[in-house]
Amino acid sequence: MRVCLVRHGETTWSLSGQHTGSTDLGLTAHGEEESRALAPRLRTLAFTQVLVSPRLRARQTCALAGFGSQSRIDADLSEWDYGHYEGLRSEDIRRQSPGWNIWCDGCPGGESPADVSARADRLIARLSTMHDTMQGTVAVFSHGHFGAALAVRWIGLALVEGQHFALHTASVGLLGTALHHPDRRTIELWNACRSPPSSPTPDL
């Protein structure tokens, strides 16, 4: 089994660098365009199942890419709960808390790194159970921070390593296993975009 990880398209807050967890923003016009552009690439993968975060931006991306009717909402794909840091930029947070790093410190009133790691592990366990009953590729439409968390936990790294796995909007990653070593998980593709992104590199 492979997992195709798709980050949602651009929103006004992804463009401005504001942390967007539970705030239910829709896509910008550019976000809609880049989500539609996912369709030709994703159609070739013949997904056996499509899971999507409950957030509007992820659901819109999934629908515009052509998979809305076959998708199922999975709350474990939600973005990191930023708690009191919702809507703030990293530079704003560091003025309050110098040296803050979400991957080490988490968010007061929201999720800790241990919380997010446990959620990613829970999702991976369920995906592995699916693998026992079906082959093929599962698509997951999610978010920047949680997508990075899922990738590092997939290959057995500590959650803090997620800070090195930036995901641009409407980008694609493929999580799989080594060809002759099915017990060895791999990252086959990461942060693949149709064209150079208009948004800055995400601040992880």
Language-model-detected regions and their locations in the chain:
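Short beta-strand scaffold positions
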Residues: V52-S53, A118, F141-S142
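Active-site-proximal alpha-helix that buttresses catalytic centers in soluble enzyme cores
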Residues: V3-S69, Q96, E111-A114
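Acidic, low-complexity terminal tails and accessory targeting/binding regions
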Residues: D81-E91, T133-G136, V152-L204
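Phosphate-handling substructures
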Residues: A65-R122, P202-L204
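Glycine-rich phosphate-binding loop signature in dinucleotide/nucleotide-binding domains
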Residues: R43-A46, L127-G136
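Generic beta-sheet signal
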Residues: V3, T133-H145
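Conserved histidine-centered catalytic loops in small-molecule metabolism enzymes
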Residues: L45-D76, G176-L204
